[in-house]
From Swiss-Prot:
The lineage of its organism: Eukaryota, Viridiplantae, Streptophyta, Embryophyta, Tracheophyta. Keywords: Chloroplast, Plastid, Ribonucleoprotein, Ribosomal protein. The keyword Protein biosynthesis does not apply. This is Small ribosomal subunit protein uS15c. SUPFAM superfamilies: S15/NS1 RNA-binding domain. Belongs to the universal ribosomal protein uS15 family. Part of the 30S ribosomal subunit. Pfam families: Ribosomal_S15 (PF00312).
Amino acid sequence: MKKKGGRKIFGFMVKEEKEENWGSVEFQVFSFTNKIRRLASHLELHKKDFSSERGLRRLLGKRQRLLAYLAKKNRVRYKKLISQLDIRER
């Protein structure tokens, strides 16, 4: 992972970011994954922050729906993405 502007950026996404491919499913899943990881680390420190916990659950659901869509449309891209982001397969 590389640091860019205070945020962690995976090397494979930097190229896509320069191409302004923000609407792609892969980039959206990447964004949700970064937000999820940031919220998870916040919740480790603030265990009673229930509104953030609810937000985390919503983000997890959104990411899961996008991953289900990608798995249905293009299984190869789905497999590549989950291996690059190091997330579990559903």
